[in-house]
Amino acid sequence: MINEQIELFKATIKGKKIAVLGLGISNLPAIKFLHKFGAVITARDRTPYDELDNDKLEVVKAYCMDFVLGDGYLDNLDGYDIIVKSPGIPPYAGQIESAVKNGAHLTSEMEIFMTLCPCKIVGVTGSDGKTTTTTVIYEMLKAEGKKVYVGGNIGSPLLDKVEQMNENDWVVLELSSFQLQTMKISPDIAVITNLSPNHLDYHKGGMAEYINAKTNIFNYQNENGKLVINADNDVTSSFEGKQKGNLIFFTRRDYNKDIACSQIKDGKIYCCGEYIMDVSDIRIKGMHNAENYLAAIAAVYGIVDPENMRNVARTFGGVRHRMQYVRTVDGIEFYNDSIGSSPSRTIAGLVAHGGKIVLIAGGYDKKIPFDTLGEAVNRYVSVIVLCGNTSDKIEKAVKDADKDKKDIPIIKTDDFESAVKTAFAAAKGIDADGERVSVILSPACASFDMFKNFEQRGDKFIEIVNSL
């Protein structure tokens, strides 16, 4: 079957001057895709020529008419028909705004993909729980016998696969505020897990800008769309009435409001009044994971049979870097929760875990407050080991929240490996008193001060733990 959107795209893109900003994982296949349809491409990236990876350099030389590398890569953007921006580059950086005012169309690899995609799309966003919810939705659709692609912040880029997709397939996307901020298209089914302060270093308009970016996941839906939002979160619940299509809430409470919902009642999960599963069926523990399932169930309700939902819940063991058990050394359990890049995500993990905890935290400063983390550390943590740019801020938050004068040991280290080894030594000195003792890497911060991403940070943690 001919994809009419792709045929139209081919006709309009040929000969267009396109600046591709950022040579990240998604834009490299985008360059090849655009080149195939006759676009005239200039690649632009902050990395200097002599530091650019060989694979990126090969793509630039083979598919681009020109390239601009180094500090001035966002200068002189006038004259382009289209600017394809990498998610990590703010839309007001450099001369992007000026180019748009002068007629350039600002878009992204993800927006191009969603425009051309012939099949139904489920999009998931939120401050926490995105990846697990996205993966559970993917697994449930797959269990129903659907052909499913997963992408966005997880998986691999999908633009170069769009020509092989058809209207009977499904796509599940994890979408960040970075991706959504400039997007003018929404998925068929939009899920917002929760919203709390995050990425305020990126969003110069603060929390309001962050929230506005997130709402683009449903702003462009039509009356056939579905919006799934968290009724227990003050921000997301305020979106009620702003949707154009169908609304379904999810909540851990017994919800009496006359709106369709996925909810927990007496340890059982119901959706729109129908029994789906027991909470105890969910293999990955913690109420935050139960919430992820509530969101996923609401998204696929009416598409996936409840028995297939239950089978996924009973067999799915979680996602790498999300409270991932690594090993036990000298009676100390080690858990990799490197995805814990915000206080709320780290707190959820601490609440669910139990036992005596030595927490490794700290990292890149996203300009978000740590007061709630300080309270949680005083309640759930035996020792906290800090490293990274935010060490002093987290230390202050923990001390300020210590109303009961517990004086929880706070140990600051100079590097990541020292932090892991220090945490191990601290854990061995804890009186277990019959409880399990765990070292948990859940930094409550991004990794950019020491690592490329949270995956690299988690992999390094596993490497160090396996060497103990």
PLM regions: where:
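Beta-strand->loop->alpha-helix junctions that form or flank phosphate-binding loops
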Residues: 46, 70-71, 107-111, 244-264, ...
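Short beta-strands and strand-loop turn motifs
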Residues: 43-45, 192-194, 230, 439-444
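Short beta-strand "acidic-cap" motif of Rossmann-like dinucleotide-binding folds
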Residues: 40-45, 150, 172, 249, ...
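N-terminal leader/targeting and accessory segments in enzymes
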Residues: 1-108, 468
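Nucleotide phosphate-binding/pyrophosphate-handling subdomain across enzymes
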Residues: 2-17, 27-37, 147, 277-382
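Phosphate-binding loop of NTP-binding sites
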Residues: 32, 36, 74-80, 87-231, ...
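C-terminal helical cap/extension that packs against the catalytic core
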Residues: 57-61, 371-437
